[in-house]
Amino acid sequence: MMDSRLKLIQDWLLQLLAEMTVSDPDGNEHEVFLVDIEVHSNKTIDIIEVFADTDSGISVENCKFLSKHISAELDASEEMQALLPRHFKLVVSSPGLSRPLTMNRQYKKNIGRLMQVTYQNADGEIKTIDGRFISLEEEAEASITLDITKIQKSKPNAKPKPPELVTIPFSQIQKAIVQVEF
């Protein structure tokens, strides 16, 4: 698929979702944001994968609602019909835990969680660290701070270790993935 076509589809979806909201089980409205879009083609069909979220998470029911809405809008849009002249399959889902974080909004909702971050340090070395994500700085040079203190089983009378904090500018982050805790 051509990059310019993907960009047009992505821009159209961004505009479509810009004012969208979904409801949680309590009836509260949440603004939807587009995390990523992937378009794959084979000989007979285009597959459009839309990864959407809200600041409080997105449910399967929300994804079904979005899928129906986006599909109806794609079918009704002459612009999209020109970009998708053949059959397409639309898949709407949450980004899931295995996908890297790509937006500040995703970072905000994951404060307090364990993360694995791959970044390029000031010396140009690629490093990967695990730690608890404790803060997000959005002013000046945007960055995240992790507590990389090793979690050890507490021994009686053991003195707790002081936090070992690492701050990483967004410009150095190559990949940040939330880790599953058991």
Curated annotation (Swiss-Prot):
Example of a GO biological process term: translation
Pfam families per UniProt: DUF150_C, RimP_N
Sequence intervals crossing the membrane: none
Compartments, record wording: Cytoplasm
Swiss-Prot/TrEMBL keywords: Cytoplasm, Ribosome biogenesis
UniProt keyword Repeat present: no
Record GO cellular component, one term: cytosol
Classification via InterPro entries: Ribosome_maturation_RimP, RimP_C, RimP_N, RimP_N_sf
Domain of life, per lineage: Bacteria
SUPFAM superfamilies for this protein: YhbC-like, N-terminal domain (SSF75420)
Family according to the record: Belongs to the RimP family.
Function: Required for maturation of 30S ribosomal subunits.
PANTHER family recorded: RIBOSOME MATURATION FACTOR RIMP (PTHR33867:SF1)
Name used for this protein in its record: Ribosome maturation factor RimP
Organism: Chloroherpeton thalassium (strain ATCC 35110 / GB-78)
Gene name for this UniProt entry: rimP
